[in-house]
A protein has these predicted regions:
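Short peripheral tails and domain-boundary helices/loops at the edges of structured domains
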Residues: 111-131
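Short acidic-glycine-tyrosine-enriched beta hairpin
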Residues: 40, 76-96
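Positively biased amphipathic helices and basic secretion/translocation or surface-docking motifs
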Residues: 1-21
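Glycine- and acidic-residue-biased ligand/ion/polar-headgroup-sensing regions
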Residues: 51-54, 60-76, 84
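Ligand-binding loop in jelly-roll beta-barrel domains
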Residues: 93-117
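Short, charged/polar surface micro-motifs in flexible loops or helix N-caps
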Residues: 41-44, 52-54, 73-75, 93, ...
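Short beta-strand His + acidic residue motifs that chelate non-heme Fe in jelly-roll/DSBH
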Residues: 56-59, 77, 95-101
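A short glycine-rich, His/Asp/Glu-containing loop-to-beta-strand
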Residues: 21-57
């Protein structure tokens, strides 16, 4: 029986929550924080926390990005993504994720190259943000 599908807590949920609580979330922009989980070469896995109504700056990708929504929802030029949905993006997609006003959003994102932002000011601080 699938406990998660039945809406029950997984026995690992507490373990994962405790492990994440010991790590430091880094602010990226107002309403946006990240927690880098793993890095290997250019590949990075991170969690993003986005407050309700947060707009991520317009960007494309230098490589591939896979994003899975763990909580909440966001919309962009590709559609609306809610809990359990996965977005697969590459350099052919330019988008601006916008979080639903109804609640916050937590997403797991794995990239194999840095993002490419359109706004020059964001590009200027991008190395400092590690994104």
């Amino acid at each position: 029986r699938n406990r998660a599908a039945a809406g029950e807590d997984s026995p690992r949920r507490g373990y994962v929550a405790d492990a994440l609580a010991k790590r430091r979330w880094s602010p990226v922009a107002p309403g946006l924080r990240q927690l880098v989980l793993a890095e290997s070469g250019a590949m990075t896995a991170r969690l993003f926390y986005l407050a309700p109504g947060t707009r991520v700056p317009v960007h494309t990708h230098r490589g591939q990005e896979l994003t899975m929504v763990l909580h909440g929802a966001y919309s962009d030029e590709c559609g609306t993504f809610a809990r359990g949905d996965v977005a697969e993006l590459d350099d052919a997609v330019t988008h601006q994720p916008v979080v639903s006003q109804e609640g916050d959003c937590v997403a797991l994102a794995v990239t194999d190259a840095p993002l490419r932002f359109r706004n020059w000011a964001v590009r200027l601080v991008q190395p400092l943000l590690g994104i």
